[in-house]
């Protein structure tokens, strides 16, 4: 029994030593693990600090198509405006021809005499300016024909004159404003003369001359003058106040009965 116990006691420390050696070897064999923070994981990639947005530049093909498009749009708009102008002109001309045909088909009674007067006045102007300059050859027939039309159609002439006058006035105002703006710009560009600096002595003399003279005596009214004289007399003289003995208050006693009361405190 003693030998069995001794063997048991010797085997237990040996087993513990062997087990501790195995555990240590296993720990040494394990690879060393390093802890990583969450922001260091690859899913948390932070953008660079000096980032800058660069807009994509168009290529040669894109720029070529853009230039072709702008050119075609410009010419298409120009052709469209010309087409609309010609269309409106043709439509107005056709409508005017239709109205003139209807008017001439059934003219009023005084139409032919009025047209005869206008034509005769135009021919008279042409004959009167046949030996003159080109300006006279144009101005005289138009002027006399206009005068004849004004005489024959006074109401329409007044309306046309009003409209023409308003348009001429608006145009003259625009021209006047343009000329005025140019004139103001020229005047602003010109250097203004600098004012001369006055000396301090001259300024002080002017200030003294502009201020009123306060040393002169001012006349007061009679009431204020008498009040000031009375106050001055009362303050200048050393008058002594003498009270009336009848008005003196002696308390509970009369001056004649002063011996009847004791003066002890």
Swiss-Prot record:
Membrane-side (Mitochondrial intermembrane) residue stretches: 28-110, 156-265
Localization terms from the record: Mitochondrion inner membrane; Mitochondrion
Principal location class: mitochondrion
Region feature Disordered, mapped onto this chain: 187-215, 229-265
Bilayer-crossing regions: 111-129, 138-155
InterPro entries in UniProt: MIC26/MIC27, MIC26/MIC27_animal
Subunit structure, as described in the record: Component of the mitochondrial contact site and cristae organizing system (MICOS) complex, composed of at least MICOS10/MIC10, CHCHD3/MIC19, CHCHD6/MIC25, APOOL/MIC27, IMMT/MIC60, APOO/MIC23/MIC26 and MICOS13/MIC13. This complex was also known under the names MINOS or MitOS complex. The MICOS complex associates with mitochondrial outer membrane proteins SAMM50, MTX1 and MTX2 (together described as components of the mitochondrial outer membrane sorting assembly machinery (SAM) complex) and DNAJC11, mitochondrial inner membrane protein TMEM11 and with HSPA9.
Family according to the record: Belongs to the apolipoprotein O/MICOS complex subunit Mic27 family.
Name of this protein: MICOS complex subunit Mic27
UniProt source species: Mus musculus
Protein's gene: Apool
């Amino acid at each position: 029994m003693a030998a069995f116990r001794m063997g048991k006691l010797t085997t237990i420390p040996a087993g513990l030593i062997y087990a501790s050696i195995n555990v240590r070897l296993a720990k040494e064999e394990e690879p060393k693990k390093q802890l990583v923070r969450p922001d260091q994981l690859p899913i948390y990639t932070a953008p660079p600090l000096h980032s800058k947005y660069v807009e994509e530049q168009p290529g040669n093909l894109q720029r070529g198509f853009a230039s072709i498009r702008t050119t075609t749009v410009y010419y298409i708009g120009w052709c469209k405006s010309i087409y609309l102008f010609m269309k409106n002109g043709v439509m107005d001309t056709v409508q005017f021809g239709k109205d003139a045909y209807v008017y001439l088909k059934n003219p009023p009674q005084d139409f032919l005499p009025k047209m005869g007067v206008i034509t005769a006045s135009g021919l008279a102007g042409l004959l009167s300016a046949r030996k003159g300059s080109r300006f006279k050859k144009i101005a005289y027939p138009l002027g006399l024909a206009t005068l004849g039309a004004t005489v024959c159609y006074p109401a329409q002439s007044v309306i046309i004159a009003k409209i023409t006058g308003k348009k001429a006035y608006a145009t003259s105002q625009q021209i006047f404003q343009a000329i005025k703006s140019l004139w103001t710009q020229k005047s602003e560009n010109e250097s203004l003369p600098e004012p001369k600096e006055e000396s301090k002595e001259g300024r002080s003399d002017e200030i003294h001359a502009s201020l009123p003279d306060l040393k002169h005596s001012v006349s007061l009214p009679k009431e204020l003058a008498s009040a000031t004289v009375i106050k001055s007399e009362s303050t200048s003289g050393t008058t002594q106040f003498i009270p009336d003995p009848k008005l003196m208050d002696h308390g509970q006693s009369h001056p004649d009965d002063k011996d009847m009361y004791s003066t002890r405190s």
